């Protein structure tokens, strides 16, 4: 049986989750990352995607996050999300609105670096929309 560790998912609006879990899969910028108890200390950035949380009872909860940071310690993990909602509460119109707003910002962008970041963000949001619509 896997050991439990404390996981907290925090957005600027509220604390979405704080409980003992067996594993958390996070959409790290460098790729999906599974965090379990006794994980090596790590800090990583988070891209838009799905955070999957598995409790000790085996219950799985999914959340949509729109970027942020994860602070991982052997005793726990805190994910500070720019924005996050339980996947069942995701308003798909809001996701489409975010994509359209990013496209508009891309049209007005002047600097190459800003354009590149926006293009990547749009790609991530579009992929996320496809993943969420499949579920």
UniProtKB/Swiss-Prot annotation:
Entries under Pfam families matching the protein:
ATP-synt_DE_N
| Alphabetical keyword list | ATP synthesis, Cell inner membrane, Cell membrane, CF(1), Hydrogen ion transport, Ion transport, Membrane, Transport
Query: Localized where?
Result: Cell inner membrane
GO CC annotations, alphabetized: plasma membrane; proton-transporting ATP synthase complex
Specify the superkingdom: Bacteria
**Single GO MF annotation:** proton-transporting ATP synthase activity, rotational mechanism
Q: Which InterPro entries match?
A: ATP_synth_F1_dsu/esu, ATP_synth_F1_dsu/esu_N, ATPsynth_dsu/esu_N
Q: How does it sit in the membrane?
A: Peripheral membrane protein
As for family, the record states: Belongs to the ATPase epsilon chain family.
Quaternary structure, per UniProt, is:
F-type ATPases have 2 components, CF(1) - the catalytic core - and CF(0) - the membrane proton channel. CF(1) has five subunits: alpha(3), beta(3), gamma(1), delta(1), epsilon(1). CF(0) has three main subunits: a, b and c.
This chain's function reads: Produces ATP from ADP in the presence of a proton gradient across the membrane.
Q: What is this protein called?
A: ATP synthase epsilon chain
């Amino acid at each position: 049986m896997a050991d439990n560790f404390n996981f907290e998912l925090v957005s600027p609006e509220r604390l979405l989750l704080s409980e003992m879990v067996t594993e958390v899969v996070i959409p790290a910028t460098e790729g999906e990352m599974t965090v379990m108890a006794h994980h090596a200390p790590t800090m990583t950035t988070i891209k838009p995607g799905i955070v999957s949380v598995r409790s000790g009872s085996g219950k799985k909860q999914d959340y949509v996050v729109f970027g942020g940071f994860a602070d991982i310690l052997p005793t726990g993990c805190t994910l500070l999300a720019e924005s996050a909602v339980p996947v069942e509460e995701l308003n798909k119109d809001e996701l489409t609105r975010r994509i359209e707003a990013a496209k508009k910002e891309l049209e007005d962008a002047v600097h190459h670096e800003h354009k590149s970041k926006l293009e990547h963000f749009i790609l991530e949001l579009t992929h996320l929309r496809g993943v969420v619509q499949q579920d």
